[in-house]
Amino acid sequence: FPNRRLRTFRLFQFREKGEQGLKGSDKLLLAKQVQHLCHRYQVPLIINDDVELACAIDADGIHLGQGDLSVVEARQLFPGKIIGLSVGTEEEYLNSPIELVDYIGSGPVFPTLSKDDASPAIGMNGLKQLRRLNSDIPMVAIGWLSAKDCKDILQAGADGIALISAISHAEDPYEATKILVDGMQAMSV
């Protein structure tokens, strides 16, 4: 992509897990390759709930789910790094040390197939409810999102979107990414 498009990416979350996911040295090698690209384009690399991998490559941060390493422990392990936390309900929000995280991943907005243990979908109303709890923390919407959803998601209060399936399941991932990036840029102008 031309540099102009890459500026739309605020961060890249490395999420390589599940039965089909790479393991061991193969996973480490892929993470290092992704990190090289991220550094080249000045995009922070966040590792999804793999503390060992995040430490091994000195990632820019880590993203945690509600059942992962505690945010307090993560902040001690990763001082000065970006820490994100998945939050899907008001109860999860109220029971989480939000003041210790840099952003929240809110959702899933829609039912998702990319995560076996996904929580129930919260819909646009759930996204709006989470935004009302705190208008200051950066909020990234997650959960089976596509280009057609971007405008509504941003209007519901999200600051950004996290995508897997909209790109990985696309017939032409490059073209799908281009459409998403161009759409996000058009909305942020």
Give each language-model segment a name.
Residues F1-R15:
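Catalytic domains of carbohydrate-active enzymes, especially glycoside hydrolases
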Residues L11-Q13, I46, H63, G84, ...:
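Conserved beta-strand positions in the central sheet of alpha/beta enzyme cores
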Residues Q13-D26, P108-D116:
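Glycine-rich, proline-tolerant flexible connector loops at the mouths of alpha/beta enzymes
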Residues E16, Q66, V87-E90, P108-V109, ...:
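Short secondary-structure boundary segments
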Residues K27-D49, A74-T89, P120-A147, L180-V189:
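Alpha-helix-loop-beta-strand connector modules within alpha/beta enzyme cores
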Residues L45-D60, G88-L100, R132-S135, M139-V140, ...:
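Catalytic cores of alpha/beta
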Residues D49-C55, A59-R75, I82-G84:
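Glycine-rich, small/polar surface segments that engage phosphate groups of diverse ligands
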Residues L64-A74, G105-A118, C150-L180:
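Glycine-rich phosphate-binding active-site loops on the catalytic face of alpha/beta enzymes
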